[in-house]
């Protein structure tokens, strides 16, 4: 996404890459037959106001799920979890891989589940999932919120309170959430409510990728590590105590090489709830 932002002639490299991959899709031997098995549907027996979709990466980082549900419990939210048993994909990895037909089939199946839930809010904490829900799903009448938007709203409405500390936090803008969806202010509002915000010397739409991008699968380990270390160098220039992000993939990637704690914004919020 950053190439498209900084390109002086406005070439949208990310869209070109996906279009090129879609031309190669039939030469790639992957099995997506699981979308016909029905096993990924999960079970929702009760209708709630908020439908929480964790996504694949949050299923692999359960501390984020625990924090998000703790926040909803504290706010007295009426919610259920769409993929509490795991196994549901939003479809974006297939779309980015050029498997548009398979992605659209997944989107169609997920749309039926979401609409049948009766929820008025779809809560998502993975920016990759959030972007496809906003851009490729037809969910009229259902508000789609990233958890940074949701937490910021809970604080502003007085539904939760955060005990502010002297901790210095630096916030990392995930590619898909910032450049991809334009969400910059809400997460910073939450961080400021929890402690002192120290900005990285490169942030916002210029933010550096964590190195875990699913859109650059051709990059080898050494190049990905170099990207991560470069991002950490810029994030830690102000000597923060904690690195905060709002993407489970970013958190996992930074944790491999960071010399200080890395936390999701939901974890920062949950541990300081009053």
Q: Language-model features: where?
A:
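Iron-sulfur cluster-binding electron-transfer modules in prokaryotic oxidoreductases
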Residues: 2-274
């Amino acid at each position: 996404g950053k190439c498209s932002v900084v390109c002086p002639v406005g070439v949208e490299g990310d869209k070109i890459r996906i279009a090129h991959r879609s031309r190669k899709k039939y030469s790639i031997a992957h099995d997506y037959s699981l979308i016909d098995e029905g096993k990924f549907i999960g079970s929702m027996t009760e209708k709630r106001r908020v439908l929480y979709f964790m996504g694949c990466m949050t299923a692999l980082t359960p501390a984020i799920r625990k924090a998000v549900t703790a926040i909803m419990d504290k706010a007295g939210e009426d919610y259920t979890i769409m993929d509490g048993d795991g196994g549901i994909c939003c479809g974006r990895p297939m779309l980015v891989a050029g498997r548009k037909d398979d992605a659209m089939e997944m989107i169609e199946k997920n749309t039926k589940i979401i609409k049948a839930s009766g929820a008025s809010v779809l809560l998502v904490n993975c920016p990759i999932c959030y972007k496809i829900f906003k851009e490729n799903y037809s969910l009229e009448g259902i508000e789609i919120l990233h958890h940074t938007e949701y937490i910021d709203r809970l604080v502003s409405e007085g539904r939760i309170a955060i005990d502010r500390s002297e901790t210095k936090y630096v916030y990392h803008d995930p590619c898909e959430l910032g450049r991809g969806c334009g969400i910059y202010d809400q997460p910073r509002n939450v961080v400021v409510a929890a402690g002192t915000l120290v900005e990285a010397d490169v942030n916002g739409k210029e933010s550096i990728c964590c190195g875990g991008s699913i859109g650059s699968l051709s990059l080898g380990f050494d190049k990905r590590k170099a990207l991560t270390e470069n991002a950490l160098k810029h994030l830690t220039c102000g000597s923060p105590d904690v690195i905060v992000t709002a993407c489970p993939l970013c958190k996992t990637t930074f944790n491999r090489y960071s010399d200080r704690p890395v936390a999701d914004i939901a974890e920062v919020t949950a541990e300081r709830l009053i």
